[in-house]
Amino acid sequence: MGLTLTLTDADLPASPAFIEFLHATLTGEAYHAGSWYQQEEESLASNEGRFENIQEKAHAVVADPKGKEHLLRSYRFFKELLTGNVHTLRDLARFRFFFVIGIPRTGGTYLTKQLFRAGGINYTTVQNALAHDGFPHLARLSFKEQGNVHTNGLLQLAEYLTMVEVFFGEHGRLAYRGGIIVPKKFTKAVYYFDLLRELFEANADYLVTLRHPLSTCRSVLDKSGGMPADGKFAVRSTIERWTLEDWLHWGVGEEQLRQMDYVECFLGYWKRFHFQMAMAGIPSMPGTRLVPYGAESMSGAAKKLYTEFGLKMEPEAFKTAEPPRFSGDQERAAQQAVEEVAGFWRSLGLAFPTEALAAKL
C-alpha cells in the first residue's frame, strides 16, 4: 500500500532497568542485583532513588556504539514480536530457557538460584530484572498512566531477550540439549504463555512451583508486615499489588476489596492463578515439571537437574517455615479452594498434587 508507520523511542522509550543493565555492561560496573535472591526480603525491595540518574546513563548508552547496537537489537526484537515475522528472534535458539513459574512465595527463588549455580554463575551478581519476577511486566491488557500495558510488556520482553543475549552470550557456560541454560523466575508467564510457547517451542523447560494456599498466604503476610490490624486486605508489597490487580480484573472495585477479609482475598487470587495456569496448558507441556513446596521436594528437584546436566554438586539447603495458624473458617475456605482447583485441573485431564501440598502445610 505504500504507507509508512513511524514509532520513535519517544513513543516507546527503553525501560530504566534495561538502560541500567546496558550501562553496567558497558562500564564494567556491578549489576543491580538488589535482594531478589534473599527469600527473607523478597517482594519488599524498593526502587526508590534507583533510577534518579537514568537519563545520564541513557545518554551514555546511546553515545556508545555497542550500547546503541544493543538498543537497536531490542527494538528489532520488539518489531518482530509486534508483527509475528520472526527472523532475528530465531537467534535465541542457541539458548535453553528454564522458566520457573508459580504464584509468589512457593519456592521459585530457590530453584532459580540453583539453576544459576549449575551454570557457574554467582546469582548474587545477576541483575534482578534478568533473573526474577517483575520484568518483563506482562499483564492483562489495560490502558494505564504509562500507556498500553500489553505493548509496553512486549517491549520489555524484547529488552529481556536482548539482555539474555548480552549476559549469557558472555557468561553462559553450561549447555543442555543443545542450548546455553538461561534461568528465569517468571510468575506472570501464566498470562502470556502462548507467547512463550511460540517463541521458544522446544527450547524451554518449565518448573512449576506449587504450595498450599494457607502457607503461601502466611509467607506473604510475613514479608508484607503481618496481618493488618483489622484483618482486611491491604496493599503494602508487590505481591499484594498483584493480588489487587487480579481482583480488579474480575470486576471488584478497590474500595470493596479493601473491606474484604485478607485471607479470603488471597485465596481468590491463589485459585484464579492456578485456574489460569491450567487453561494456559503449562502443566501439560512435555518440558514441565511440577515441584510441590518442601525441603525434600525442592532440593530433590535441583539435585535431579544437576544429574541431568552431568554435574556432581549438591544444591543449597532449602529453608522452610513453621506451619501457619489460621481460624477454622479460614482453613475450611482454603480447603475448598484447593478442591476447586484440583477439580478444575482434573476436568482438563491434569493432576493437581493435593496430598503433597497438604503434607507440607
Predicted regions and their residues:
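Conserved, well-structured beta-alpha core segment at the onset of a catalytic domain
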Residues: 1-7, 82-98, 164-201, 323
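PAPS-dependent sulfation machinery
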Residues: 113-192, 199, 233, 242-255, ...
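Compositionally biased, flexible interaction segments
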Residues: 120, 151-152, 300-304, 318
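A structural signal for short, well-ordered beta-strand segments and their strand-loop junctions
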Residues: 99-102, 122-126, 182-185, 205-210, ...
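Short, charged, surface-exposed secondary-structure boundary motifs
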Residues: 132-136, 216-220, 323-324
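PAPS-dependent sulfotransferase catalytic core
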Residues: 1-166, 227-260, 314-361
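PAPS-dependent sulfotransferase catalytic domain
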Residues: 188-315
